[in-house]
Amino acid sequence: MKRLINKLHQEQMLTAEEFHRLLANRSEETDLYARELANQVRQEVYGNKIYVRGLIEFTNYCKNDCYYCGIRRSNQNAQRYRLTEEDILECCRQGYEIGFRTFVLQGGEDGFFTDDRIVQIVRKIKEQYPDCALTLSIGEKSEESYRAYREAGADRYLLRHETADPRHYMRLHPLEMSGENRKSCLRILKKLGYQTGAGFMVGSPLQTVDDLVEDFLFLKELDPEMVGIGPFIAHQDTPFCNERSGTLDDTLFYLALLRLMLPNVLLPATTALGTIHPRGREMGVLSGANVVMPNLSPVSVRKKYMLYDGKICTGDEAAECRMCLSRRMERIGCEVVTDRGDYKKRLA
């Protein structure tokens, strides 16, 4: 298997059959080898810099009914909330003061936030903080909507594809949702010049090795600037409430493969990774990740944005989260930096 890992490192690509062999025949030794190699690649491209993104979860209303998600529309137990424009700008103000230069506006697909409202919020943030990057993560929209946000000043867009296999996608989502539509959205985002982020759940219900092969092949074809992966964690108020979580080892191995396949990618060590293991985010960085995303949302709403059970850091103030992550990264020889942390284009 080391031969395949070396090939992925050198050529940044494997065939479907090679990916299948690599994913189906793992050992502790090959996992560790891939993770150490990916950590070297991260250092070669980005040094020991770890980029922070200030996450603002501004609405937990959602029109979708994804079977794995705690803010799905059918969840009658979810305490719904929306931040006002003033709330969002105050989160940015606090974040800016403590060093954040990228803000991520994330929310469910909430019809209250029309294109006009989103455009106005984007414009105000970019007017007040012109040196900052702004990322949106608000789901599937039309090309016209994506263009309007881009023209207003949005720099990046996160839209996890969740699974690239159409049959698996149908098992995780209701019939009105389409994996092909999500892929189409990602291609439109790339075309419009966004730094684009895709990604998948690790260990989601009914996930097979074949599904994972499809994920890696799709990500190679899309060539996104960002990839977000994290372990599936069940939420008590969803149809998947009794399903087992994705594992730490799987997530770390797939992070490593992504770094080897897409050496310049911006790769978060997610909150979900920190939820399944106390040092999950540090281990993610040592497996090739180079982004962390502390929460800037008001503490009063943090516990309401529960996509999965047991989410960490719901009670800490933003400054505490920032300092805690800085200390954690320093202990593993890395430095949390306050610049925009843009994608580094590969030299031809």
Feature-to-residue mapping (PLM):
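Glycine-rich, proline-tolerant flexible connector loops at the mouths of alpha/beta enzymes
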Residues: 53-56, 76, 104-115, 167, ...
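Auxiliary Fe-S-binding modules of radical SAM enzymes
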Residues: 1-28, 96, 220, 226-348
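Catalytic cores of alpha/beta
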Residues: 142-149, 205-218, 275-286
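Alpha-helix-loop-beta-strand connector modules within alpha/beta enzyme cores
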Residues: 113-138, 177-195, 243-265, 317-329
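Canonical Radical SAM [4Fe-4S] cluster-binding loop centered on the CxxxCxxC motif
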Residues: 46-87
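Conserved, mostly hydrophobic/aromatic
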Residues: 11, 38, 66, 105, ...
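Active-site-proximal loop/turn and secondary-structure-junction residues that shape catalytic pockets
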Residues: 56-58, 109-111, 138-142, 163-165, ...
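Core AdoMet radical
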Residues: 73-89, 95-116, 122, 126-186, ...
